[in-house]
C-alpha cells in the first residue's frame, strides 16, 4: 500500500521529471488578496502570474498546497466529520503552466501519472469536459484514445472554474474514479451523481479568461493551466478505502483522538471532526493566525471550539486538543517543517484557548438547554443564537451543530440580522470616501533606484486622476504619476512610502505618498506649479530627513525582533509593523504583558547592537540560499524568487525589501515608549529612535524634575516621598468617608421616613456626600428592615446623583429600576439597575424637592395597586 507521504513525494518527483519547478506551499493567508479569507486552491499563489502582473523565472511549476475551506464562499465546516470527503484543511496536489503547455500536454501528464506512475486501471476512469470544449474532447478521444462514451460533456459551472467572483477562470476537464457497482451513485451529469461511486480525483483548468467585477471576461495574456488533485482523496483511492478518514494519515490522528478523549467508539463522527480540525488549527497558528473575535482569528476560534465540544461529547473530561499536535508533527512534520518549528506555540495556543472556552461553555450549554425546553416548534431563535455568540463566545455553527444533534434548526437569518445591528452600532461615523488609487491597475514597470540614491532623473510614463489615465494634470488636482525609474520607496513591508518632489521645467509636483500597482510605482500627490504631461522629463527628489529617520526606525525593528526572541522566546514572531519617520510600531505573538525587567533587557540588547556599530549589509540571493543562511521570513510578506537579505552583524538576519541605515550606530538610540495587548496572544511595542528617543528621554527627565521640585525631594528620597504621600492620601480618604457617613447619620433625624402598611419608605436629599456614602446608607436600611424602599439623592451645583434600594421581599410590588426612571424624568437625567438596586444622575438640581415629592406619589400609587 502506498502511504500518503509516499504519494505526496511521487507527485512532486513525476512533475520535476517533466521540467516543472517545485515551489513550496504558500501560507494559508493570501498575501495582498482581499478577495480571499484563506488560500483555498493551489493557484492562489500564482494568481498575479496568470494575470500577467507578476513574472517568474520558470514557466512550469508543481506544488503541494496547504488549503483551508472554513469561511466565506468556500466553507465546508458544517459537513466536516459527517461525510467521507469534506475537510477544513486539505492538501492540493497541482501542476501549472504559465503560457507554456496547454490542453494536450496537461491532459497527457495527468493521464500518464494516473495510469503509469500510480497504476490506476484505465477501465476505472471517466472524464468530463465543458460542453463546448471540442479541443479537450479531441485530446481525450484522439490523442489519449479514450472511448467517446467515457467522455461526458457538462454544460454547467461544474466544468467552468473560477476562484471567486473575480479573477482567472476557464473551462476545465475532470477525471473521475469508479469505486464499483457495489457503491451507490451515478455518472457525472446524472441525477445520481452525488453518490459515492464516481469520485472526482483531478480537475484540470484551462485558464483562458479573467473575470471582472461586472461579470465580463477578457482573455488572459497567455493561455495557462491550473490543476488540482486532493491528496486525501487520491490516497483513499490508492489505499482502497471509500472515506478519506480511512487513509493512513487520518487513522493515526483518529486513534490518537480516541486515546486522549477516552472515546469508546472509534467510528464516532466526533473523532473525525477532531482529526480534521487539529490539522486546520495547527497550520493556521503556524501561519501566524491566533484566536480572536473577528476575521481569520474568529474562524480559528470556531474550529478550535467545535473540536473541543466534540471531544467533550465523546467523553473528554479534561483539556485534550493540544495532545494531538505530537501525532500531527509525526505524520506531517517532514513535509511541513513549520509544524516542528512552531510546535510549542501551537500547543500553548490550543491549551490557552481550551481553558478559556471551558470556563464559558457550561453556562452557554445551560442557556441552550433552557431554550430548547421552552421551544414551541423546532427552531431556535436568532436572538438566542446571538446571545450565545455575544455573551458566551459560541460561534453560530457550534449552536447549529448542537441544534442539529437534537433534530432542531436555528433561525440563521434572524441571527445575521442581530449581527448586522451590532456592526451598525460599532461602525464609526464618517463620510464614505472612494479610494480611486486602489482602482489603478497599471501594466508598466518602474525601476526602483532608491537603495543607492535619493535623486533620479526620470520620465513620466502614466498619469492618473480619479483612477483614470489622463494625458496631463494641472495645479492642485490630486493625481498619481508613474515614472520609468524612481528613488521613491513605495509602501510595503510595514514601511511607509517616501515623500518628496518631482520637478521639471516650469512644474513642481509634491509627492505625499507612494504605493505599488503590480510593477508600477505610484507617486501620489498634486501639482503645485505649472502643468505635467506624459513623457515629460523630470528630477525625482526624496525628502532626505524623513527617509533617514524612517530607515533608522526600520533597522531598529530588525534588532527589536531578534531581541524579543532572545528575551521572551522563539515564539515571539512578528505579526505586523508600521515604520515611519516618527516612530516604529511592532506587533508580535506573546501571551502576557512584558514585565518591566524584560523591557529593560530588550532595550539593553538593542542598544548594545547600536553601540557596536555593525555594518548593515545587503545581499540578493535565492529563497533557498537565504533560508540556509538562517534569514527570518516575515509573516504575511510575499517574496519573489530572488530575495533581499539584510544582516546586522551576527545579531540579525532577515528578508526585507525596505530601506535601512548603513551602520547600526546610525540608529543612535532606541527607546520603548509603550507596550500593550492588541488581540488575544498579540502584543504591541511602540518605540522611537535617534533624536526622538533623546527628546523622549528629556521629556521624562523634565517631568521627574518637576515632581521632585513639587515634593521638595531629591533622587535619593523621591520614591519614599511619593509612597508617603499616597499613604497620606489614602488615610485622608478613609477619614473623609468616615466623616461623610457621620454627616449622613447626623442628618438621619432630618430624613423623612413613612410607613405604608408594613413597608418603610425613605425619600430624602442629603448634601455634602458622595454616591458611595449613599449606597452604604441604602445597604444599612435594607439590612435593618425586611421591607423598605429607600430613595436618597445628593446635589452638587446643577448635578444630581441618586441611589435607590428596594428589599427583595417586595420587588414584585415595585422595582428600583422603575423608581429610577421616574426620578430621572424630573431631573433631566437617566438611571437604571436591578429590581433591588438602582442608581443614576441628572443635570437639574433646582427642583429636587418637587422631584422627590413626585417619586413619593409614584411609590404610593404602585404599592396601593
UniProtKB/Swiss-Prot annotation:
Catalytic activities: tRNA(Ala) + L-alanine + ATP = L-alanyl-tRNA(Ala) + AMP + diphosphate
Compartment list? Cytoplasm
Gene3D superfamilies attached to this UniProt entry = 2.40.30.130, 3.10.310.40, 3.30.54.20, 6.10.250.550, Bira Bifunctional Protein, Domain 2, Threonyl-trna Synthetase, Chain A, domain 2
Cofactor binding notes: Binds 1 zinc ion per subunit.
Q: Which PROSITE patterns match?
A: AA_TRNA_LIGASE_II_ALA
What domain of life?
Answer: Bacteria
Question: Which Pfam families does its entry note?
Answer: DHHA1, tRNA-synt_2c, tRNA_SAD
Carries keyword Metal-binding? Answer: yes
Gene Ontology MF term list: alanine-tRNA ligase activity; aminoacyl-tRNA deacylase activity; ATP binding; tRNA binding; zinc ion binding
Residues that hold Zn(2+) according to the record: 554, 558, 656, 660
Q: Which residues form the signal peptide?
A: none
UniProt keyword Cell membrane present? no
Annotated Gene Ontology cellular components are: cytosol
**What free text does the record give on domains?**
Consists of three domains; the N-terminal catalytic domain, the editing domain and the C-terminal C-Ala domain. The editing domain removes incorrectly charged amino acids, while the C-Ala domain, along with tRNA(Ala), serves as a bridge to cooperatively bring together the editing and aminoacylation centers thus stimulating deacylation of misacylated tRNAs.
Described purpose of this protein according to its UniProt entry: Catalyzes the attachment of alanine to tRNA(Ala) in a two-step reaction: alanine is first activated by ATP to form Ala-AMP and then transferred to the acceptor end of tRNA(Ala). Also edits incorrectly charged Ser-tRNA(Ala) and Gly-tRNA(Ala) via its editing domain.
Q: Which NCBIfam families match?
A: alaS
Family of this protein: Belongs to the class-II aminoacyl-tRNA synthetase family.
Which protein, by its recorded name, is this? Alanine--tRNA ligase
Q: Highest lineage ranks of the organism? A: Bacteria, Pseudomonadati, Pseudomonadota, Gammaproteobacteria, Thiotrichales
Gene behind this chain? alaS
Amino acid at each position: 500500500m502506498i502511504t500518503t507521504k509516499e504519494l505526496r513525494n511521487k507527485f512532486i518527483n513525476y512533475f520535476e521529471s517533466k521540467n516543472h519547478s517545485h515551489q513550496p506551499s504558500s501560507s494559508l493567508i493570501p498575501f495582498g488578496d482581499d478577495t480571499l479569507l484563506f488560500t483555498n486552491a493551489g493557484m492562489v499563489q500564482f494568481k498575479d502570474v496568470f494575470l500577467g502582473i507578476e513574472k517568474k523565472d520558470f514557466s512550469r511549476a508543481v506544488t503541494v498546497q496547504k488549503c483551508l475551506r472554513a469561511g466565506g464562499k468556500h466553507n465546508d465546516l458544517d459537513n466536516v466529520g459527517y461525510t467521507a470527503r469534506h475537510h477544513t484543511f486539505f492538501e492540493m496536489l497541482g501542476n501549472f503552466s504559465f503560457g507554456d503547455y496547454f490542453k494536450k500536454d496537461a491532459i497527457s501528464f495527468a493521464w500518464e501519472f494516473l495510469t503509469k506512475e500510480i497504476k490506476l486501471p484505465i477501465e476505472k476512469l471517466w472524464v468530463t469536459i465543458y460542453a463546448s470544449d471540442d479541443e479537450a474532447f479531441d485530446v481525450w478521444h484522439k490523442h489519449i484514445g479514450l472511448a467517446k462514451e467515457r467522455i461526458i460533456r457538462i454544460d454547467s459551472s461544474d466544468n467552468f472554474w473560477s476562484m471567486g467572483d473575480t479573477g482567472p477562470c476557464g473551462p476545465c476537464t475532470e477525471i473521475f474514479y469508479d469505486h464499483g457497482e457495489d457503491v451507490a451513485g451515478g455518472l457525472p451529469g446524472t441525477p445520481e451523481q452525488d453518490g459515492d461511486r464516481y469520485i472526482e480525483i483531478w480537475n484540470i483548468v484551462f485558464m483562458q479568461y479573467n473575470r471582472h467585477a461586472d461579470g465580463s471576461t477578457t482573455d488572459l495574456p497567455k493561455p495557462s493551466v491550473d490543476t488540482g488533485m486532493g491528496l486525501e482523496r487520491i490516497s483513499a483511492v490508492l489505499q482502497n478505502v471509500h472515506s478519506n478518514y480511512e487513509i493512513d494519515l487520518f487513522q493515526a490522528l483518529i486513534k490518537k483522538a480516541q486515546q486522549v478523549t477516552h472515546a469508546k467508539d472509534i467510528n464516532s463522527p466526533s473523532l473525525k471532526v477532531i482529526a480534521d480540525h487539529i490539522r486546520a488549527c495547527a497550520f493556521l497558528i503556524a501561519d501566524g493566525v491566533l484566536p480572536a473575535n473577528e476575521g481569520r482569528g474568529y474562524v480559528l476560534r470556531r474550529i478550535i471550539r467545535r473540536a473541543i465540544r466534540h471531544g467533550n461529547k465523546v467523553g473528554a473530561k479534561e483539556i485534550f486538543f493540544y495532545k494531538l499536535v505530537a501525532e500531527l508533527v509525526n505524520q506531517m512534520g517532514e513535509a511541513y517543517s513549520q509544524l516542528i518549528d512552531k510546535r510549542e506555540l501551537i500547543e500553548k495556543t490550543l491549551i490557552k484557548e481550551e481553558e478559556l472556552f471551558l470556563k464559558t461553555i457550561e453556562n452557554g450549554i445551560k442557556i441552550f438547554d433552557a431554550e430548547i425546553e421552552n421551544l414551541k416548534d423546532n427552531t431556535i431563535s436568532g436572538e438566542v443564537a446571538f446571545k450565545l455568540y455575544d455573551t458566551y463566545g459560541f460561534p453560530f455553527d457550534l449552536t447549529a451543530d448542537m441544534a442539529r444533534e437534537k433534530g432542531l434548526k436555528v433561525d440563521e437569518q434572524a441571527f445575521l440580522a442581530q449581527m448586522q445591528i451590532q456592526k451598525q452600532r460599532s461602525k464609526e461615523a464618517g463620510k464614505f470616501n472612494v479610494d480611486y488609487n486602489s482602482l489603478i491597475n497599471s501594466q508598466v514597470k518602474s525601476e526602483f533606484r532608491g537603495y543607492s540614491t535619493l535623486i533620479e532623473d526620470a520620465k513620466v510614463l502614466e498619469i492618473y486622476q480619479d483612477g483614470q489615465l489622463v494625458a496631463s494634470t494641472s495645479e492642485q488636482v490630486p493625481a498619481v504619476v508613474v515614472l520609468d525609474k524612481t528613488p521613491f520607496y513605495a509602501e510595503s513591508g510595514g514601511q511607509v512610502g517616501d515623500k518628496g518632489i518631482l520637478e521639471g521645467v516650469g512644474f513642481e509636483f509634491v509627492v505625499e505618498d507612494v504605493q505599488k500597482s503590480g510593477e508600477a510605482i505610484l507617486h501620489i500627490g498634486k501639482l503645485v506649479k505649472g502643468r505635467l504631461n506624459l513623457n515629460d522629463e523630470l528630477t525625482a527628489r526624496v525628502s532626505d530627513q524623513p527617509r533617514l529617520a524612517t530607515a533608522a526606525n526600520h533597522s531598529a525593528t530588525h534588532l527589536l525582533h531578534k531581541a524579543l526572541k532572545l528575551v521572551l522566546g522563539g515564539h515571539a514572531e512578528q505579526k505586523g509593523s508600521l515604520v515611519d519617520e516618527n516612530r516604529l510600531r511592532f506587533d508580535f505573538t506573546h501571551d502576557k504583558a512584558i514585565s518591566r525587567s524584560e523591557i529593560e533587557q530588550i532595550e539593553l540588547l538593542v542598544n548594545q547592537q547600536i553601540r557596536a556599530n555593525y555594518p548593515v549589509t545587503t545581499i540578493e540571493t535565492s529563497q533557498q540560499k537565504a533560508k540556509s543562511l538562517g534569514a527570518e521570513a516575515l509573516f504575511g510578506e510575499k517574496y519573489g524568487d530572488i530575495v533581499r537579505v539584510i544582516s546586522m552583524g551576527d545579531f540579525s538576519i532577515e528578508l526585507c525589501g525596505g530601506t535601512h541605515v548603513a551602520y547600526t550606530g546610525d540608529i543612535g538610540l532606541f527607546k520603548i515608549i509603550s507596550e500593550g495587548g492588541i488581540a488575544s496572544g498579540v502584543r504591541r511595542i511602540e518605540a522611537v529612535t535617534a533624536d526622538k528617543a533623546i527628546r523622549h528621554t528629556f521629556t521624562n527627565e523634565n517631568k521627574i524634575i518637576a515632581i521632585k521640585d513639587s515634593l521638595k525631594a531629591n533622587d535619593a528620597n523621591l520614591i519614599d516621598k511619593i509612597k508617603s504621600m499616597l499613604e497620606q492620601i489614602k488615610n485622608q480618604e478613609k477619614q473623609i468617608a468616615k466623616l461623610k457617613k457621620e454627616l449622613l447619620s447626623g442628618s438621619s433625624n432630618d430624613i423623612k421616613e413613612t410607613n405604608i402598611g408594613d413597608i418603610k419608605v425613605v425619600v430624602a436629599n442629603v448634601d455634602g456626600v458622595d454616591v458611595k456614602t449613599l449606597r452604604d446608607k441604602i445597604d444599612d436600611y435594607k439590612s435593618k428592615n425586611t421591607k423598605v424602599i429607600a430613595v436618597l439623592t445628593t446635589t452638587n451645583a446643577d448635578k444630581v446623583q441618586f441611589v435607590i434600594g428596594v428589599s427583595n421581599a417586595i420587588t414584585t410590588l415595585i422595582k428600583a429600576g422603575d423608581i429610577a426612571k421616574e426620578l430621572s424624568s424630573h431631573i433631566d437625567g437617566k438611571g437604571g439597575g436591578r429590581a433591588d438596586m438602582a442608581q443614576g444622575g441628572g443635570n437639574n438640581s433646582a427642583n429636587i424637592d418637587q422631584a422627590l415629592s413626585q417619586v413619593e406619589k409614584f411609590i404610593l400609587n404602585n404599592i396601593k395597586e
